[in-house]
Amino acid sequence: MKHTLYIAKVGDEKRAAYAYIVTNYEGIQAAGHFITAGKHRHDGQMTDHIAFQRALRAASALAGVVDLTIVFDHSLIDLAFEMVAVERPKYPSIYQNSVRLTGRFHSYEFASTDFNETGACPEEVSVMDDAMEVLGNCRTFKGRLLLLKNCLFNNKIIIS
């Protein structure tokens, strides 16, 4: 069955937030987000690959995913260029893991779009809104406490 993975990234001076949505003709099948924290939070290429790999794992865990179209946000265009071998990867071992994870699917193709408000499909807008909401929540006191709790107990959404 054909699925589409939308992935987006937003960031500020302290951290970055990633969000993804996996859809098919029935609607949204999976969604999630990740937040950078720790010593690698400002290393965009490394955290981009880690978020991409986690989103691919979530997509491959769904039953019936055979064909996957991966739609990158404009902020992840460097990752897209690495994946189609236009640019040389900064971290070859992490790049190889990303390539290996795409091999879980019968076929896959890459696409890129600029998630803006003109001409965007609902999934593109939704994934961008999710990433912006997660980043916005990290700016509040309650959000920072939740981020600390997630760093300690729910490490699945933290990229460190």
Task: Go through each PLM region and give its residues.
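Feature targets compositionally biased, intrinsically disordered low-complexity regions
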Residues: 26, 31, 37, 63, ...
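Flexible, glycine- and charge-enriched loops at secondary-structure boundaries
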Residues: 41-49, 87-91
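Short amphipathic alpha-helices and their capping/turn segments at secondary-structure boundaries
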Residues: 55-65
